[in-house]
Amino acid sequence: MSVADDILNDLHGGIANTLDDLRRELASVRTGRASLHLLDGVRVDYYGTSTPLNQVATLSVPEARLIMVKPWEKNLIPVIEKAIRDANLGVNPQSDKDLVRVPIPPLTEERRKEIVKQVKHKGEDHKVAIRNQRRDAKELIEVAEKDGDIAADDAKKALDKMQKETDEGVKKVDEIVAAKEKEVMQV
């Protein structure tokens, strides 16, 4: 494998990681429907240790606008309820005798537009990350060419492949963002 191939493989892996990161970030964006990803960032004080909610309770979505949290220990119910409330997710958890219900209120049109702006902003941030990776890879190719590790023709081919890879990555970011926008704006 040549130096150019190594650099292109690193770029490909970096772009894939950036796309995965964007998907993960957008999964936790509220859409007006119940999604377990909404509670991903919630941590509970479990015997003095900050523990992710999904490690102390069973989470489920029985209805489109309801998340149910069934703790494995009943004494955690008030702690879980407080943690969800303190997470500033725009939801109001309600505790029962053995579980916590988290009803998801419908989003207003104004709030939907705000969320779409946030989604677009995250998409732009990830496009910039992809372009920065291309810039770094381009610099590596140019240095390798200058040092004589890569022939000029191979460097040109590698730069063309890098541009294609970058364009595909940016296009995928646009597709992911468009799908999330559609999901958020759906009533």
Curated annotation (Swiss-Prot):
Q: Does the keyword Aminoacyl-tRNA synthetase apply?
A: no
As one GO molecular function, the record gives:
ribosomal large subunit binding
Family matches, as SUPFAM superfamilies: Ribosome recycling factor, RRF (SSF55194)
InterPro entries linked to this entry: Ribosome_recyc_fac, Ribosome_recyc_fac_dom, RRF_sf
Signal peptide residues are none
Give the location in the cell. Answer: Cytoplasm
Q: What is this protein called?
A: Ribosome-recycling factor
